[in-house]
């Protein structure tokens, strides 16, 4: 049915005609997410008619059908204006049972009406900055969190819980003030941690399920996303003992999340949200990842259960198969693994054994191949700065931040970026709490070590001498051509001669020479003023 026909039916004021037209329109467009521009004005007209009745109040028997029509029209970005007034948003909040206005909430709300209203609010908040502002001003987050807190005591339909959490996610993703309000005033981390525990089915008496059902998976992912939003900018520096205990409890739930599967094909997506949130936890709270007692089926290393680390490595390998949005895909899990390796010696040694096993193939460049080491070394020269930084940082920590060892596994050419950023181009080792790990060399590596090109990280075939057969005059001529080419590139600022500062940083050759001269003058007693 065309929107013009529906609008004309609404204008008749006849209840049976209106409801028949709306039901027909809803059925026809239930899966419509794109709209014909030619009917745009008709849809706007219909939206205005629906809103006028919505704000005045709907008869209980008509609410679901009416709200379904509002939901369909709220998908059209060109029809949002009628729905984004303060009055219409307040009406939707009342029907969703999340209005903070006194006396505006029915005692026993119809859950079908609540659900349709939540869907309308989600559409509006997603697409309209005005709706986002009005929702924040109306403090919808307060009533939403109150209802979320009742999930343990009362039974709510899955869809209502899901869209409660989806609306919380949208508000916290799009409004900084709502994030802060949920984190501080409403104690959102504790509330949502308890809700996550309930959703996962974790109880002190028994083991949680190893396979999370589809509905619980959907709700758990929304909870993880909201927790990520409110902890992203809020957890800075040290936390007190009470907060540390809360974050450790959340960490144990996330540990469980990365080790279970979900119904359907959403396991990797679920793990991704858990890993993202792990990266927001205070570093000292990541120790809960290693508190599981070893058992018969677990991966044990140096007396520590490494099941979580193995699960994170498997997740990393899956993400490395992706070719797009690598920053979002691999940076979070690499950051978590890096911090685990930095703070926990058994974890670092286990990861090094898995990622950087003793070198045997010394004739292949480190970035060539399908081993995990090869894939990570390739990322060290990725176009995205954040991707190459986290990949290099991870491998550097696995090498106990030893420059020679880092170059050995990656090649100087691949390692140069991190070494330059760290001021380690001249070698050395930064300050860090690392024990002197043994780095056992294989017989193959020992035999070929003297022939390995440190820049490429492999044994190179000796190239032919390009000057073989040349006279001295020809050699001098070629050398002068090379000098002229470099001079031209330098004058045109295509390249810039670089030198090494005393602190190991790359700097322009001119600055390096000036610094050297200044040091010589300052150390020369004859240069002191009279």
UniProtKB/Swiss-Prot annotation:
The modification Phosphothreonine is found at residues 440, 442. Its main location: cytoplasm. Pfam families: Ric8 (PF10165). It is found in: Cytoplasm, Cell cortex; Cytoplasm. One of its GO terms (molecular function) is G-protein alpha-subunit binding. One of its GO terms (biological process) is G protein-coupled receptor signaling pathway. PANTHER family: SYNEMBRYN, SYNEMBRYN-A. Interacts with GDP-bound G alpha proteins GNAI1, GNAO1 and GNAQ, and with GNA13 with lower affinity. Does not interact with G-alpha proteins when they are in complex with subunits beta and gamma. Interacts (via C-terminus) with RGS14; the interaction stimulates the dissociation of the complex between RGS14 and the active GTP-bound form of GNAI1. Interacts with NCS1; interaction is favored in the absence of Ca(2+) and myristoylation of NCS1 is not required. This is Chaperone Ric-8A. The lineage of its organism: Eukaryota, Metazoa, Chordata, Craniata, Vertebrata.
């Amino acid at each position: 049915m065309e929107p013009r026909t529906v609008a004309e039916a609404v204008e008749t004021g006849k209840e049976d005609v209106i409801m028949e037209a709306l039901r027909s329109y809803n059925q026809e467009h239930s899966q419509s997410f794109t709209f014909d521009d030619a009917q745009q004005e008709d849809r706007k007209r219909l939206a205005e008619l629906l809103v006028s009745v919505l704000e005045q109040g709907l008869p209980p028997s008509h609410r679901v059908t009416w709200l379904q029509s509002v939901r369909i029209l709220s998908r059209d970005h060109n029809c949002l204006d009628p729905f984004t007034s303060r009055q219409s948003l307040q009406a939707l909040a009342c029907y969703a049972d999340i209005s903070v206005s006194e006396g505006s909430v029915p005692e026993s709300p119809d859950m079908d009406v609540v659900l349709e209203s939540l869907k309308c609010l989600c559409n509006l908040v997603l697409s309209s900055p005005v709706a986002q502002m009005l929702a924040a001003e109306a403090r919808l987050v307060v009533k939403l969190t109150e209802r979320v807190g009742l999930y343990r005591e009362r039974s709510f339909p899955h869809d209502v819980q899901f869209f409660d959490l989806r609306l919380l996610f949208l508000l916290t993703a799009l409004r900084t003030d709502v994030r802060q309000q949920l984190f501080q005033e409403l104690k959102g981390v504790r509330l949502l941690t308890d809700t996550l525990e309930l959703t996962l089915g974790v109880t002190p008496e028994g083991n949680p399920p190893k396979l999370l059902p589809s509905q619980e998976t959907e709700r758990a992912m929304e909870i993880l996303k909201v927790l990520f939003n409110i902890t992203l900018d809020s957890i800075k520096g040290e936390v007190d003992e009470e907060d540390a205990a809360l974050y450790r409890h959340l960490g144990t739930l996330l540990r469980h999340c990365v080790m279970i599967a979900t119904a359907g094909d959403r396991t990797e997506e679920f793990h991704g949200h858990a890993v993202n949130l792990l990266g927001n936890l205070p570093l000292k709270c990541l120790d809960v990842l290693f508190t599981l007692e070893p058992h018969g089926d677990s991966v044990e290393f140096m007396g520590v259960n490494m099941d979580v680390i193995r699960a994170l490595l498997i997740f990393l390998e899956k993400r490395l198969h992706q070719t797009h949005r690598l920053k979002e895909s691999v940076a979070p899990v690499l950051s978590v693994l890096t911090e685990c390796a930095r703070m926990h010696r058994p974890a670092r040694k286990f990861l090094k054994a898995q990622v950087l096993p003793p070198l045997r193939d010394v004739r292949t460049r480190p970035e060539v191949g399908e081993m995990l080491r090869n894939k990570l070394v390739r990322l060290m020269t990725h176009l995205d700065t954040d991707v190459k930084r986290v990949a290099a940082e991870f491998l550097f920590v696995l090498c106990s931040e030893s420059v020679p060892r880092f170059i050995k596994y990656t090649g100087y050419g691949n390692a140069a970026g991190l070494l330059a950023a760290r001021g380690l181009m001249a070698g050395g080792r930064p300050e860090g709490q690392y024990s002197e790990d043994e780095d056992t060399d294989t017989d193959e590596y020992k035999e070929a070590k003297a022939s390995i090109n440190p820049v490429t990280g492999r044994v190179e075939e000796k190239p032919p001498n390009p000057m073989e057969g040349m006279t001295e005059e020809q050699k001098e001529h070629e050398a002068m051509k090379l000098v002229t080419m470099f001079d031209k590139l330098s004058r045109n600022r295509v390249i810039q001669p670089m030198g090494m500062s005393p602190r190991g940083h790359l700097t322009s050759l001119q600055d390096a020479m000036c610094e050297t001269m200044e040091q010589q003058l300052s150390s020369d007693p004859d240069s002191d003023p009279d």
